[in-house]
């Protein structure tokens, strides 16, 4: 569970190799000011397979997100053998069972004009007991979330499944998987994700 509101402005810094210096360099404060009136939202995963977004002030649900690679589990939530007097009950399918993490990142997003990098608020939702995978969403505008991609490691069939923001699904066999999608060692994602800036070919 995580509560996200307006981004805080960064403290100016001239000390290199710090987050504060990077934010100063990339004009983070302009992004913070542009989103200063953003509503406060509570994001929480549930064992019904859905990531829920609630208005933190009113408690009203804004939307729910079902990871596309886990949607096939939804029918198993109904169990007619339970609570037979009331025509059945429900099983926990977990789904988005991990703790979501949110961070403001300077990235080249699918929404970027001309491929330029920009500041976006990114939510990463691990599946926890729901499976060996995670989903990444853009929640810069809380009422209009954007699914960037989801990854799921299917250990039973020895495949890694990837779905993009264009709803394009790719499945890679363990023995022929591209290095950028080599999540063959990924297990159930119980730990909170760590989002960090690292060197990448000078980018």
Where are these regions (language model features)?
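A fold-level detector for beta-propeller and closely related beta-sheet-rich head/sensor domains
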Residues: 2-203
